[in-house]
């Protein structure tokens, strides 16, 4: 990949990041809440979360990044592999953030703890006009889909796909070795724990978590496949660009394959 092409790739990610920041600041649609449905949003307002936003972002971003550099260190993968993996992971996370935020703003679904965000004293007005802090109330209208769930799966599912490719979990030479399958599933389990914790914190309904998880996993897989072949491919451990520049005299199995 030339300098111009790399610059264009990075530019796309910068624009997506800016779009993410802008959508973070916009107010959501104020969906009308009927008195008979208030029970859905009357769960306690919990400030101590199992996975605070900062911790979730660290996990979602650093897990795939750590695996990329660990693979390079342990298997002596070339710079092209690491660069393509970083581009794929960053694209998945950036696209996920923009799409998740836009859907949140359009839907404007109240969180399970919205009642106590809207009425901190627990006393609802007859016209249901909120008396709570405006920022807290607006954040309470961003339940669907779950951002924690989508980011967790965007980052950790990508890590799973990357591991599966490097370990050949789904090719003939990698099947039948249970530790490889466990390694592939571990990040997905961690992502599920983060996602489900949002229902325990009363920050999301189960539908928010389910759809958010699906969004994150979809972007993780789509972006992974933009740079890497299918996980059933015998050369799934190599990015497309690396395969294109492979000398015809070199056997595919000689590059970046871990035999255990």
Curated annotation (Swiss-Prot):
Tissue expression notes: Specifically expressed by antibody-secreting immune cells.
TM region(s), chain numbering: 51-71, 87-107, 151-171, 176-196, 206-223
Region of interest called Phosphatase sequence motif II, as start-end residue ranges on this chain: 145-148
Gene behind the chain: Plpp5
Enzyme Commission (EC) number: 3.1.3.4, 3.6.1.75
Enzyme class: hydrolase
UniProt pathway: Lipid metabolism; phospholipid metabolism
Cytoplasmic compartment segments: 72-86, 172-175, 224-260
Protein name: Phospholipid phosphatase 5
Annotated positions for site Stabilizes the active site histidine for nucleophilic attack: 208
Species the sequence originates in: Mus musculus
Recorded catalytic activity of this chain's protein: a 1,2-diacyl-sn-glycerol 3-diphosphate + H2O = a 1,2-diacyl-sn-glycero-3-phosphate + phosphate + H(+); a 1,2-diacyl-sn-glycero-3-phosphate + H2O = a 1,2-diacyl-sn-glycerol + phosphate; 1,2-dioctanoyl-sn-glycero-3-diphosphate + H2O = 1,2-dioctanoyl-sn-glycero-3-phosphate + phosphate + H(+); 1,2-dioctanoyl-sn-glycero-3-phosphate + H2O = 1,2-dioctanoyl-sn-glycerol + phosphate
InterPro entries the UniProt entry points to: P_Acid_Pase_2/haloperoxi_sf, P_Acid_Pase_2/haloperoxidase, PA_PP_rel
UniProt note: phenotype after gene disruption: Mice lacking Plpp5 are viable and display no overt physical defect.
Keywords tagged on the record: Cell membrane, Hydrolase, Lipid metabolism, Membrane, Transmembrane, Transmembrane helix
């Amino acid at each position: 990949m030339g300098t111009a092409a790399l610059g264009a790739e990075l530019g796309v990610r910068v624009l997506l990041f800016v779009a993410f920041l802008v959508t973070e600041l916009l107010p959501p649609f104020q969906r009308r809440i009927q008195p008979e449905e208030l029970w859905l949003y009357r769960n306690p307002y919990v400030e101590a979360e199992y996975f605070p936003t900062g911790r979730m972002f660290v996990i979602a971003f650093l897990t795939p990044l750590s695996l990329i550099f660990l693979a390079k260190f342990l298997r002596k993968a070339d710079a092209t592999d690491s660069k393509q993996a970083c581009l794929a992971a960053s694209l998945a996370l950036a696209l996920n953030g923009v799409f998740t935020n836009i859907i949140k703003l359009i839907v404007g679904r109240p969180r399970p703890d919205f009642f106590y965000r809207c009425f901190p004293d627990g006393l609802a007005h007859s016209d249901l006009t909120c008396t709570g802090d405006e920022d807290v109330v607006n954040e309470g209208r961003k339940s669907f889909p779950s951002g924690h769930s989508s980011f967790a799966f965007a980052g950790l599912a990508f890590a799973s796909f990357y591991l599966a490719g490097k370990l050949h979990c789904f090719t003939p030479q990698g099947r039948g070795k249970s530790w490889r399958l466990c390694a592939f599933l571990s990040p997905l389990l961690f992502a599920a724990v983060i996602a489900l914790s949002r229902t325990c914190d009363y920050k999301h309904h189960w539908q928010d978590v389910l759809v958010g998880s699906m969004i994150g996993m979809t972007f993780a897989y789509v972006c992974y496949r933009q740079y890497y072949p299918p996980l059933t491919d015998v050369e799934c451990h190599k990015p497309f660009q690396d395969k294109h520049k492979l000398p015809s005299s070199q056997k595919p199995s000689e590059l970046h394959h871990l035999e255990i």
